[in-house]
């Protein structure tokens, strides 16, 4: 069925607050951005990744179907309701033995009964001495079925579901890379952290710190409207100003918490190798999401963390800027990383 999408592919990124989509089309031998858009969701339709307002969600998905004029899609599942488990496996065992090992140990690692879980696995890094890491992604089957029913009731056929972190890695990690990276996806209400070896996600987690946390801190400190606080966050950020309202102190206070969360994950990765093959250290941090382009944030984190921190490039596996310039701005493209990674999954390009 994936061959049906050889000339057009759409990724749909569903979160608590909005649905973003991006479709890619073939132009000769190249991929080009075809359509993209975002629809806000009313409060309570999705909460913590769980669907509570299915009828409203279906209505929004129907609008998206009309806009992209496609039936087949790739769709993200919520990071806060999904798990990635890393296990060290001995060499030279069959895939059936892999599955049995996963089933045996899964309930020890995630709070889902094995009979109620859907999971997939892929090979991670290899140790010549110990074996290799098996990376298993897990989600509750009923949650996946909720999303499937909503999509099909809207007339969309999901070819594949995958975790947000996996779609992000496909979008922003250069194909064939073996770099070890931390991806920080800064959304409105939360930030998602993932650690990748090449394009494979080994660890993923979330914290309730996002763009709205920053905006509310500015609003409280400077006594401005939330709209003005968001404007200050996006236009001035961590750049110091001699005159006028300066959100530096407000943003630093929240950015320090974000920095500490990054430090915790760096420390865990670099110092914990129990049950997994020996790890090489993380070499860089990539920022994405709707709040990744706050002026001065990457530079602040670089100076404190001691690693190179930069905005991600979601076009790295799609197009060359020498050949074409996408119609999205850089700020917009950072919001659509997950949707673009999903579209790549079913684009017909050899990414998987």
Regions found by a protein language model. Give the residues of each.
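Active-site neighborhood for divalent-cation/phosphate handling
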Residues: 76-173, 284, 316-317, 335-338
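Non-catalytic, solvent-exposed interaction/assembly segments
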Residues: 1-105, 145-147
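Adenine-nucleotide phosphate-binding core of ATP-dependent small-molecule kinases
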Residues: 220, 231-281
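Glycine-rich phosphate-binding loops at beta-strand->alpha-helix junctions
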Residues: 277-310, 314-316
């Amino acid at each position: 069925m994936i061959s049906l999408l050889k000339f057009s592919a759409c990724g749909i990124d569903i979160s608590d607050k909005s649905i973003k989509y991006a479709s890619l089309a073939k132009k000769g031998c190249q991929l080009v951005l075809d359509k993209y858009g975002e629809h806000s969701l009313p409060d309570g339709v999705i909460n913590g990744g769980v669907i509570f307002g299915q009828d409203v969600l279906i209505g929004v998905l129907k609008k998206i179907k009309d806009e992209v004029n496609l039936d087949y899609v790739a769709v993200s599942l919520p990071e806060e309701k999904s798990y990635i488990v890393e296990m060290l496996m001995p060499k030279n065992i069959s895939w059936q033995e892999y599955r049995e090992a996963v089933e045996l140990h899964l309930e020890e690692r995630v709070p889902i009964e094995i009979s109620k879980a859907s999971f997939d696995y892929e090979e991670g890094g290899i140790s010549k001495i110990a074996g290799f890491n098996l990376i298993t992604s897990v989600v509750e089957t009923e949650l996946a079925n909720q999303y499937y029913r909503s999509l099909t009731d809207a007339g969309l056929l999901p070819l594949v579901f995958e975790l947000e972190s996996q779609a992000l890695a496909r979008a922003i990690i250069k194909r064939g890379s073996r770099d070890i990276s931390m991806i920080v996806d800064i959304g409105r209400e939360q930030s998602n952290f993932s650690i990748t070896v090449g394009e494979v996600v080994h660890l993923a987690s979330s914290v309730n710190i996002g763009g709205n946390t920053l905006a509310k801190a500015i609003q409280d400190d400077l006594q401005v409207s939330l709209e003005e606080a968001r404007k200050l966050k996006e236009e001035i950020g961590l750049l110091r100003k001699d005159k006028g309202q300066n959100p530096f102190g407000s943003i630093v206070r929240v950015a320090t918490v974000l920095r500490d969360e990054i430090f915790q994950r760096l420390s865990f990765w670099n110092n914990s190798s129990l049950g997994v093959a020996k790890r090489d250290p993380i070499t860089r941090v990539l920022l994405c999401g709707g709040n990744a382009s706050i002026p001065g944030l990457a530079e602040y984190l670089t100076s404190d963390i001691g690693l190179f921190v930069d905005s991600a490039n979601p076009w790295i596996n799609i197009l060359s800027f020498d050949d074409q310039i996408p119609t999205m701005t850089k700020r917009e493209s950072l919001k659509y990383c997950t949707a673009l990674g999903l579209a790549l999954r079913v684009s017909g390009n050899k990414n998987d």
